[in-house]
């Protein structure tokens, strides 16, 4: 009888231990399930972050493509502007050459006019000297008359030459006036061309600044792409680690569930054995 009681006490103790282990295993199972759920939530969050990073990367790449296209357009505009500047420089050079030739013709006409004026002054002086002389000697008078005739002839010739020179001078003055008008027109064109050059220069400076900003934006996009790529790699690594953790936790849950089933079977076996023992005792 004592042996039976001891056996019953041992079986009861084993039953209590089995129930405690079962409760412990159930608690561990709940904790493992909670950890698994948290890991799944973390994996879901990481997947969302990964998707967001991929979307950000696509946006940055699209922005970089647009920036490169804009930069190519600026390069084309810069090339066209340089061509326009070269054409303007050629036009300015031709105008400067035309102006230089006009100035040479003006200097030549001025020199000829001075020479003609000097010759006319000399003839007039000689004529006045001959007219003012009073000679009593006939030979001298004849000579003077001959000289006067010659002087008059020279004066007439001088007048004729003066008229011719005056006519040529008028032509020269007309040419000079036209040259001055052309020079003024050339100066106006030069001013306009200088203004165009200034505008083109400002445009070139603006293009250079835009190109520099585009380069800076390109570097910033590259740096941002590099950062996003690193974040993407880190997120992928974390996702892989989380997936491995979930797999490990799932294995642990499966193991605990198997152990719980075994403990329940042991508990059922002990309970059946106790019931059988009680039945046997009742038979006595």
From Swiss-Prot:
Stored SUPFAM superfamilies: Tropomyosin
Its biological purpose: Tropomyosin, in association with the troponin complex, plays a central role in the calcium dependent regulation of muscle contraction.
Taxonomy of the source species: Eukaryota, Metazoa, Ecdysozoa, Arthropoda, Crustacea
Residues the record lists as N-acetylmethionine modifications: 1
Name this polypeptide is given: Tropomyosin
Subunit structure: Homodimer.
InterPro entries for the chain: Tropomyosin (IPR000533)
Gene name, Swiss-Prot/TrEMBL: TM1
The family this protein is said to belong to: Belongs to the tropomyosin family.
Sorted UniProt keywords: Acetylation, Allergen, Coiled coil, Repeat
Biased composition (Basic and acidic residues): 12-38
Provenance organism: Pandalus borealis (Northern red shrimp)
Region named Disordered: 1-42
Coiled coil segments of this chain: 1-284
Superkingdom of this protein's organism: Eukaryota
One of the Pfam families matching this protein, by short name: Tropomyosin
Gene3D superfamilies named in the record: 1.20.5.170, 1.20.5.340
UniProt-listed PANTHER family: TROPOMYOSIN
Domain remark from Swiss-Prot or TrEMBL: The molecule is in a coiled coil structure that is formed by 2 polypeptide chains. The sequence exhibits a prominent seven-residues periodicity.
PROSITE patterns reported for this sequence: TROPOMYOSIN
